[in-house]
Design a protein with these regions (language model features):
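N-terminal extension/subdomain marker
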Residues: 1-210
Length: 210
């Protein structure tokens, strides 16, 4: 965990990484819960709550993680976020455990948090493509970042990982009006004008990830 997250922090893919493990398996229709750490205080990261989930394989061969496995684990991470403001869940945790301490710390900040991110760490190879709207926590779309064995090797070799970002403009009733500037066989170009308040709101929500 520490080796990989140190690389993520260095590459500015996350602000911080604090490790703890909590997992409750899925039972029938009752969604499981999983968290293997979080990205530090949301108040220090544009009110973004980042949760880490891990899927580690002990196989000597590199395994392929399929989309169903990936989504199932991500949803368990999202369910951990959903449970933070549940007194029933918090009271079920051992008071001396790390998960109790960190969950209560996050609960005290829950009203300040305005966005969520789940970072999936695995030594398997990921080939599925997950859109952000596939995973929700507290009725908000989660940003998803999958760091598989291939991405880890790139980080170790000093290669930057481009982080795809989807900005949901409709959530706040916004849009970007554009005018066609030119069209040719290779590409189309457009012109737009954005006001300062709009740009400030995007920066407030997405910060250094832009």
């Amino acid at each position: 965990f520490t080796e990989v997250t140190d690389l993520l922090i260095e590459d500015k893919l996350c602000q911080d990484a604090i490790h703890f493990h909590y997992e409750r398996p899925t039972m029938g229709a009752k969604m499981g819960i999983q968290s293997d750490g979080y990205g530090g205080s949301p108040s220090e990261d544009q009110n973004l709550l980042t949760i880490f989930v891990i899927d580690y394989s002990f196989s000597e061969e590199v395994e392929i993680i399929n989309k169903d496995e990936l989504i199932r684990t991500l949803k368990k991470g999202a369910n951990f976020i959903n449970q933070i403001d549940s007194s029933l869940f918090r009271n079920s945790l051992e008071e001396t455990s790390e998960e109790f301490i960190y969950t209560n710390d996050l609960y005290r900040q829950i009203d300040l948090i305005n966005s969520y991110e789940i970072i999936f760490l695995t030594n398997k190879s990921e080939r599925a493509r997950i859109k952000e709207h596939d995973i929700k926590a507290r009725n908000e779309n989660c940003r998803i970042l999958v760091i598989d064995i291939n991405q880890i090797e790139k980080l170790k070799n000093g290669q930057n990982i481009p982080k795809e970002m989807i900005i949901d403009l409709e959530k706040d009733g916004n849009s970007i009006p554009v005018l066609t500037a030119s069209v040719n066989n290779d590409y189309k170009s457009y012109l737009t004008v954005l006001n300062g308040d709009f740009l400030a709101k995007i920066y407030e929500d997405y910060g250094h990830r832009l």
